[in-house]
């Protein structure tokens, strides 16, 4: 801290807010520090160090901190430390987690596992507990805020839900005091201290000290002699900050703490009365107003039997013991905070892995091509809770080439999603016919800020009904398009085998369905599809009744009763890049089955 006052441009702090982030995501944070934050050619965050004329990535600064911790631990243990368990905020996204892991590698460490800070805290508190308990972990640190709900018992630590805000923490409380002091000084003296980096750093240090004092005292005396100077001489700040005034300065931030708590309980399908323990983690939870908020919301006195500054590290040590085999009978089950899926036809998102899915997890779906002769597919991986692509975040995209030309719906492409125990996502697409594979590990994509995550979740609830209605329109149209395509294809292939009266009826209903699709009214499309399906059933019946036809007359109808909808997936406007997922048979496909039986 002394260095930050005398050498503010070359002293780095609160680097955690920049790790794994793009510059466009940290514009506000970059203005709150005394050192210079710049962007490189890829819009990545760099921290400028004028003393040595070099720019550092946030991972490099974090690595230096880790290296110092490793050196201290090695001296204490009298043994070399080469492996570690590293904790991160629960709402860290994929890029932030990967960047944290990179920092460990830069520091010469093998990072065995990345675990969420609230989860680590529960390990420290719940160690050796035998009774089943439901725990809420309220983790408010210097730069981030996390809430997790867990079930703990018999050595199993299962995370039920997690929520948070990666733009909220003790630094924000400090800034309110800094702004108050600077505003008062500017009003009285006409000088903006925020433009003086050395003065800004002194204000920040003093604000943090005052905040800490107000955790135990009702007022704090602030003295900053020689904060600046004018032609009239040196200027000083001498004032008093009461606890009541401090709480008034950041009352809106206190309100922001409520939402993640409420969200985490709702996602876990629990109420406050279901909680057995409430654990406070992080130095900022010492603030009386924060403690009082937790008491009022949960109706329980928080458990503070473990030092909130040390509890996460203790939990990480327990997890390290589990991985090393020194601690047994403990199982840790964490979750992913956001849903993962693909872009689908009509600009909708199809979720493959829902939010709060237990990690590690792996899920796959089989798709096919959406156009005849299609030789490639492009897959856009999304993160978020809304129904439509435009309201979610694109994590990255990749293309699978070399698919042999074939009729629409024939090739099979398996798309597999894997999220490891560290919460890092990888996606693989395999053409099952040729064995060709393409994959992507989501590490370099622009990251998703925590407040944007909360916005996504809240908007998903707010617009759920509207989104569902729009989604139904698109899904119905997609299904109708598929029915039209398949029916026309079969009529063409069957040719003169179809009796003229039957063919005319099918073509008439086809025309009605096309008109309904153009009209865009969901119910009209459904009615037209049902009418067409009836005529297609009659077509199938007429084929069975022809001499030489095989199978039972009722076979097509029985199969028809099992039909469901079809889904299509696309990445680009070019139909050659579209993916088609068939989950059932349409009525027109039944005709193809009838024809095959005739042969």
Curated annotation (Swiss-Prot):
Residues 545-573 are annotated as: Disordered. It is found in: Plastid, Chloroplast stroma. SUPFAM superfamilies: Actin-like ATPase domain, Heat shock protein 70kD (HSP70), C-terminal subdomain, Heat shock protein 70kD (HSP70), peptide-binding domain. It comes from the Eukaryota. GO terms for molecular function: ATP binding; ATP hydrolysis activity; ATP-dependent protein folding chaperone; heat shock protein binding; protein folding chaperone; unfolded protein binding. Pfam families: HSP70. InterPro entries: ATPase_NBD, Chaperone_DnaK, Heat_shock_70_CS, HSP70_C_sf, HSP70_peptide-bd_sf, Hsp_70_fam. Residues 554-568 have a biased composition (Low complexity). Keywords: ATP-binding, Chloroplast, Nucleotide-binding, Plastid, Stress response. GO terms for biological process: chaperone cofactor-dependent protein refolding; protein refolding. Its main location: plastid. GO terms for cellular component: chloroplast; chloroplast stroma. Interacts with newly imported chloroplast proteins to assist in their maturation. Belongs to the heat shock protein 70 family. This is Stromal 70 kDa heat shock-related protein, chloroplastic. The gene is CHSP70.
């Amino acid at each position: 801290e002394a260095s930050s006052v005398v050498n503010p441009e070359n002293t780095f702090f609160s680097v955690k807010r920049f790790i794994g982030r793009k510059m466009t995501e940290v514009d506000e944070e970059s203005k709150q520090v005394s050192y210079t934050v710049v962007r490189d050619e890829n819009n990545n965050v760099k921290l400028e160090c004028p003393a040595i004329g070099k720019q550092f990535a946030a991972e490099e600064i974090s690595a230096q901190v880790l290296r110092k911790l490793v050196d201290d631990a090695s001296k204490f243990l009298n043994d070399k430390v080469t492996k570690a368990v590293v904790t991160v905020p629960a709402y860290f996204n994929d890029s932030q987690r990967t960047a944290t892991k990179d920092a460990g590698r830069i520091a010469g460490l093998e990072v065995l596992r990345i675990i969420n800070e609230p989860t680590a805290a529960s390990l420290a508190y719940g160690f050796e507990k035998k009774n089943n308990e439901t725990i809420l972990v309220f983790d408010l640190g210097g730069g981030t805020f996390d809430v997790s709900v867990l079930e703990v018992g018999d050595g199993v630590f299962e995370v039920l839900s997690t929520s948070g805000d990666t733009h909220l923490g003790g630094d924000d409380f400090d800034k309110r005091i800094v702004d108050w002091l600077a505003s008062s000084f500017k009003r009285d003296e006409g000088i903006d201290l925020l433009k003086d980096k050395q003065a800004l750093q002194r204000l920040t240090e003093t604000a943090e000290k005052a905040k800490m004092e107000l955790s135990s005292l009702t007022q704090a005396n602030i003295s900053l002699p020689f904060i600046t100077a004018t032609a009239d001489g040196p200027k000083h700040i001498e004032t008093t900050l009461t606890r009541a005034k401090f709480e008034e300065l950041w009352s809106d931030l206190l309100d922001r703490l409520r939402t993640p708590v409420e969200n985490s309980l709702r996602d876990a399908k629990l109420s406050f009365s279901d909680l057995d323990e409430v654990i406070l983690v992080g130095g900022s939870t010492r603030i009386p107003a924060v403690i009082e908020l937790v008491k009022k919301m949960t109706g329980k006195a928080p458990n503070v039997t473990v030092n909130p500054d040390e509890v996460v590290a203790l939990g990480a040590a327990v997890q390290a013991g589990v991985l090393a085999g020194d601690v047994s009978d403990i199982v840790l089950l964490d979750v992913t905070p956001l849903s993962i899926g693909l872009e689908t036809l009509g600009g909708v998102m199809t979720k493959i892995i829902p939010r709060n899915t237990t990690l590690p997890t792996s899920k796959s779906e089989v798709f096919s091509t959406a156009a005849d002769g299609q030789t490639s597919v492009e897959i856009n991986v999304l993160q978020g809770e809304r129904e439509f692509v435009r309201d979610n975040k694109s994590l990255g995209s990749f293309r699978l080439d070399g698919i042999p030309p074939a009729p629409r719906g024939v090739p099979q492409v398996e798309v597999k999603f894997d999220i490891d125990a560290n919460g890092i996502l990888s996606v693989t697409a395999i053409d099952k016919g040729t064995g060709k594979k393409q994959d992507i590990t989501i590490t370099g994509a622009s990251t998703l800020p925590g407040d944007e995550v909360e916005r996504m979740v809240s908007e998903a609830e707010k617009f759920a009904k509207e989104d569902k209605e729009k989604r139904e329109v698109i899904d119905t149209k997609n299904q109708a398009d598929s029915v039209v395509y398949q029916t026309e294809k079969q009529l063409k292939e069957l040719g003169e085998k179809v009796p003229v009266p039957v063919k005319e009826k099918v073509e008439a209903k086809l025309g009605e369905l096309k008109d309904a699709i153009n009209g865009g009214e969901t119910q009209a499309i459904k009615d037209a599809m049902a009418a067409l399906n009836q005529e297609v059933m009659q077509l199938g019946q007429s084929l069975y009744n022809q001499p030489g036809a095989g199978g039972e007359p009722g076979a097509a109808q029985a199969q028809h009763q099992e039909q469901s909808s079809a889904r299509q997936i696309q990445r680009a406007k070019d139909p050659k890049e579209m993916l088609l997922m068939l989950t059932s048979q349409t009525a027109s496909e039944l005709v193809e089955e009838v024809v095959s039986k005739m042969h």
